[in-house]
């Protein structure tokens, strides 16, 4: 469909721009101009990918090694270049498909995650009414 505005994660736009999803998706992504709201204020929400160790994990030593590896430059470069997500450590730049947007990104560190949950039912209702599935 067509729209003047859309909400999307930057990694989806970068994936489309990469051509991995085909020429049609790449052409569509080239018509999009990303923007991050609230950059002069609180910043913009950022999704995170997290990892942890279960209390009853039978192999805590190797779990710790995995977590430590995931925050190395090597692992972060792999993540950045294969998922188009933002790096979690300083010194690793976002993928060039993200950087080419020419935008700085200020993350919203003020809004508690629980605030998003409070609005989940209303957001789901709006999406359903709009025909999103």
Feature map (PLM): residue ranges:
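Ligand-binding pocket segment of bilobal, Venus flytrap-like solute-binding proteins
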Residues: 1-37
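Solvent-exposed, acidic/flexible segments
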Residues: 6, 43, 59-63, 72, ...
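Broad hydrophobic/π-residue packing in well-ordered secondary structure
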Residues: 9, 13, 35-36, 51, ...
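Extracellular/periplasmic bilobal clamshell ligand-binding domains
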Residues: 96-133
């Amino acid at each position: 469909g067509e729209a003047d505005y859309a909400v999307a994660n930057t990694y989806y736009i970068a994936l489309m721009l990469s051509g991995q999803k085909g020429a049609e998706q790449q052409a569509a992504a080239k018509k999009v101009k990303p923007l991050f709201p609230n950059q002069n204020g609180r910043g913009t929400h950022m999704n995170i990918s997290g990892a942890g160790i279960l209390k009853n994990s039978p192999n805590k030593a190797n779990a710790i090694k995995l977590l430590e590896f995931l925050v190395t430059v090597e692992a972060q470069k792999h993540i950045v270049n294969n998922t188009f997500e933002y790096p979690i450590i300083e010194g690793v730049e976002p993928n060039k498909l993200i950087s080419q947007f020419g935008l700085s990104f200020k993350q919203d560190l003020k809004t508690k995650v629980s605030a998003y949950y409070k609005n989940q039912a209303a957001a789901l209702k709006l999406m359903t009414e709009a025909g999103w599935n």
